[in-house]
Amino acid sequence: MLRALARPLERCLGSRASGDGLLWQSELRPHAGGDYSIAVVQANSRLEDQSQVFTSSSATYVGVYDGHGGPEASRFVNRHLFPYMHKFAREHGGLSVDVIKKAFKETEEEFCGMVKRSLPMKPQMATVGSCCLVGAISNDTLYVANLGDSRAVLGSVVSGVDSNKGAVAERLSTDHNVAVEEVRKEVKALNPDDSQIVLYTRGVWRIKGIIQVSRSIGDVYLKKPEYYRDPIFQRHGNPIPLRRPAMTAEPSIIVRKLKPQDLFLIFASDGLWEHLSDETAVEIVLKHPRTGIARRLVRAALEEAAKKREMRYGDIKKIAKGIRRHFHDDISVIVVYLDQNKTSSSNSKLVKQGGITAPPDIYSLHSDEAEQRRLLNVLY
């Protein structure tokens, strides 16, 4: 009886995936151009990944925000970025590259302002940041914007070839990670007089020996040299000597018209891509049913993480959050199907304004319903 009563709520808010108390999913939902599936697995003591999808009859917004140093920055982006995009799109007559850049800039500036105000009480906020991956589909045009190393991958078929025979994986985002030689060169070029700007420590390249990503929301102490001289931050924070910003919040943005051979998009935090290649992820989506496909990708990544430790997936599921971070990162996945025949006005009108925000912490069992209502009121 109780299980039957719970099913409608799970269809609305999403549910824990069977067998893993730290894995949450929403199996399949409609958007104006097809369906989407979302799943999250928690590894950290506090979930640092945040993710969301909002839909209307004319547009679909997708966001994956991979926090570091704590969840504050990713939660902030989760609350503010989409409302800014919607506000500026209305002011400028629709979505555009400039609208997206303006929304990112406003979100960054507002977060930095909050950090400055909270510095006397919470100086550690200056060390919190978040990668930021956004996808937006409007009028058959796709926008992908990102900061950091979350990734968007397109699965498509070659024109005239049966999709059952395979799909091509195309990476749409740029990894802003100093593990990539071109990114290291970019960071060094912006800091030519700092021989310590990129260091190889603990087996990987890091900016100032601390962080791998070169672009983010937040990480104020690596963007604003004045924090090094601030007495409060010197006493209670982690002052890093800087001559100029070591990181930026300038997103990489691509724009493309969707084509009939474009089948689906995969948006995911780097916790997924650490274990699965672009090609493997696309193959999994292509060969399996839609329902629960995001969870299937998460499970595939966890199985790979288990193999690396000579364990089984069942063993990983038993590990508590916090300790589990030693085996894998938080992972967020959103799969968006692109059904060209559903983009007609008659079909898109059937899609209600709405969407879903993943839980701020999987332990809470459900998405933040009040926060979701607040965002919907702002957006619509």
Curated annotation (Swiss-Prot):
SUPFAM superfamilies on file: PP2C-like
Top EC class of this enzyme: hydrolase
Molecular function GO terms recorded: metal ion binding; protein serine/threonine phosphatase activity
Positions with a binding annotation for Mn(2+) 2: 66, 270, 329
Keyword terms, alphabetized: Hydrolase, Magnesium, Manganese, Metal-binding, Protein phosphatase
Function description: May dephosphorylate and repress plasma membrane H(+)-ATPases (PM H(+)-ATPases, e.g. AHA1 and AHA2), thus influencing negatively plant growth and fitness.
Family classification: Belongs to the PP2C family.
Catalysis: reaction(s): O-phospho-L-seryl-[protein] + H2O = L-seryl-[protein] + phosphate; O-phospho-L-threonyl-[protein] + H2O = L-threonyl-[protein] + phosphate
Binding site for Mn(2+) 1: 66-67
Organism: Arabidopsis thaliana
Cofactor or coenzyme needed: Mg(2+); Mn(2+)
Protein name as catalogued: Probable protein phosphatase 2C 63
UniProt EC number: 3.1.3.16
Co-factor binding details: Binds 2 magnesium or manganese ions per subunit.
Pfam families (alphabetical): PP2C
TM region positions: none
InterPro entries the record matches: PP2C (IPR015655), PP2C_BS (IPR000222), PPM-type-like_dom_sf (IPR036457), PPM-type_phosphatase-like_dom (IPR001932)
Domain PPM-type phosphatase intervals: 35-338
Disruption phenotype: Plants missing PP2C42/PP2C-D2, PP2C64/PP2C-D5, PP2C79/PP2C-D7, PP2C63/PP2C-D8 and PP2C68/PP2C-D9 exhibit an increased hypocotyl length, as well as an enhanced sensitivity to LiCl and media acidification.
Keyword Secreted: no
